[in-house]
Amino acid sequence: MEIRIELLIHEDLQTFKKDIQEAFQKVFEDMYGPSEVIILPEADIDQSLNTKGAISYKATMNEIIVGGAIVVINRETQHNDLHFLYVKYGIQTKGIGKMIWDEIERLHPETLVWETTTPYFESRNIHFYVNKCKFHIVEYLREVNEAGFVGDGGEGMFRFQKVMKTD
């Protein structure tokens, strides 16, 4: 299986957004049942895409988008953030997410620390980040969320860090 990681281009943006929303929605609904609420609103994706230092990637296999990521690179501190990483719904658990992450690390060798978050209920993501990608859980975020946010199922989020190298 050959996965290519490329910069997301404008022509692929709607597919990227639709696929990431579906992936997040299905994971939430698998845990909590059907929801009328969109778990990952387009505005949240747009906010990440428009964050200073944001780089968005698509992962393709046979020229079909199978996943992607949005990272935010702080060129001064090299403490960088993984805002989103997804694998298209229906093809998870085949190693695609790990291939995406490995390529992101390769593309950003100057990174000192990576940081990301995932919902408390998402045990598959926790396993992925801790056991596959070698992140460490550094904080449990159980704060009151902004009005309308349900993406953590009301259970909070874990914050992860991965120290790549020391200053």
Regions found by a protein language model. Give the residues of each.
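Conserved GNAT acetyl-CoA-binding A-motif
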Residues: 108-120
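Conserved beta-strand in the GNAT
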Residues: 58, 64-73, 81, 86
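Conserved acetyl-CoA-binding loop-helix of GNAT-fold acetyltransferases
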Residues: 87, 93-106, 131
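Conserved GNAT-fold acetyl-CoA-binding loop/helix
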Residues: 24-46
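A short beta-loop-alpha structural element at the N-terminal edge
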Residues: 3-18
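Conserved catalytic-core motifs of GNAT/GCN5-like acyltransferases
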Residues: 117-119, 126, 130-157
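A short helix-loop-beta-strand connector motif used in the catalytic cores of GNAT acetyltransferases and
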Residues: 43-58, 67
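Conserved acetyl-CoA binding element of GNAT-fold acetyltransferases
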Residues: 78-89, 117-118
